[in-house]
């Protein structure tokens, strides 16, 4: 009886070890700190996503995407490194299949669906103003006018639903719950927001006392949206040089 039990346990251990050495594509679990891995059998990604997957026991493996207009898949070997990983990068909404082939000829097929991505810009502070070229008294008048003209104050948010890499649907919510719908176009250095008959061009300004880093969960440190409204005041204040207003925001991922 003891001999049979020992043989059974040894068999389980052997099967387990063989399974560990199986050709697999693994997806990291967790956020900034990886807590483990699980086999990757399919991917549902937002248009802004980027996946780095581990290929285990594939030898000199290769990868190909069935539709490179939808998903780019490539083997990445960091400079000076002795390891590689699989990068899956969505380019537009749609579906594709990523095929990973081991050195021995085994294949793993990973269906990939690419949809929208959602990001929220939460307003963290009241408006900050920078005015040059007028007297202190005139500056106070301009600040008062700017305050009355602000649409979004602390506690409000801009919700960005990306249908493409740099554009999509905009939802604006004020602290008292007023909602506006519109569209946006953006890049690393700006946001162009169109809603309620308005078109606002925000420049992006990062804090000098910090750094901007995208993590696996894509939470970022606060930064500023800066709007240049100098032209509004040139007629009334001929000497004016600059009028800028800024809002401190934080960007968070919702998908």
Predicted regions and their residues:
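Residues at the start of alpha-helices and the adjacent loop-to-helix junctions
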Residues: 8-9, 82
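Extracytoplasmic soluble-region selector
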Residues: 18-255
